[in-house]
Amino acid sequence: MKQLIFLLICLLSLLQYRLWLGDNNLSEYVLLQTQIAGQEQSNGKLVARNQILKEEIIDLKRGTEAIEERARNELGMVKEGETFYRVVGSELRERNPFNR
C-alpha cells in the first residue's frame, strides 16, 4: 500500500512539473490565448476593411458616379463649363499669416 501511495505521489509530482514548468506549460497557454485574441481582433479589422474595398470595387465597376466622385475629390477635377468655388472657413483665415 505504501508503494502505491508513493507511486501516485511521484506521478502527481511529475504531472505538476509538466503543468507548471515543462514544455507547453500553463503560462505559455495563457500567453498563446492572449496572442490569439489579439490576432482575431486584427483579423476582424482586416475583414471589415476588405469588405469596404470590395464594395468600392463593385461600385467603380458598375457606374460612372463613383469614378467622377473620386476624380473630383482626389484629383480636383471639374467638368467642362463648370466653375469651382472653394469656401475657406474662418479657422483657415485666422491661421493664414498672409491674410493680415
UniProtKB/Swiss-Prot annotation:
Q: InterPro entries given for it?
A: Cell_div_FtsB, FtsL/DivIC
UniProt keyword DNA-binding, yes or no: no
A GO CC term assigned to this protein in UniProt: cell septum
Annotated membrane topology is: Single-pass type II membrane protein
User: Which stretches of this protein does UniProt put in the Periplasmic compartment?
Assistant: 22-100
Query: Where do the coiled-coil regions begin and end?
Result: 49-73
Span-the-membrane segments of this chain are 4-21
Instruction: Keywords in alphabetical order, please.
Output: Cell cycle, Cell division, Cell inner membrane, Cell membrane, Coiled coil, Membrane, Transmembrane, Transmembrane helix
Subcellular location per the Swiss-Prot or TrEMBL entry: Cell inner membrane
Where does this chain mainly localize? membrane
Entry annotated with the keyword Hydrolase: no
Taken from the record's topology, the Cytoplasmic segments are: 1-3
GO biological process: any one?
A: FtsZ-dependent cytokinesis
Family named by the database record: Belongs to the FtsB family.
UniProt xrefs under HAMAP family: FtsB
Its biological purpose: Essential cell division protein. May link together the upstream cell division proteins, which are predominantly cytoplasmic, with the downstream cell division proteins, which are predominantly periplasmic.
What does the record note on quaternary structure?
Part of a complex composed of FtsB, FtsL and FtsQ.
Which NCBIfam families does the UniProt entry name for this protein?
PRK00888.1
Q: What is this protein called?
A: Cell division protein FtsB
Q: Which organism is it from?
A: Shewanella frigidimarina (strain NCIMB 400)
- Upper lineage ranks? Bacteria, Pseudomonadati, Pseudomonadota, Gammaproteobacteria, Alteromonadales
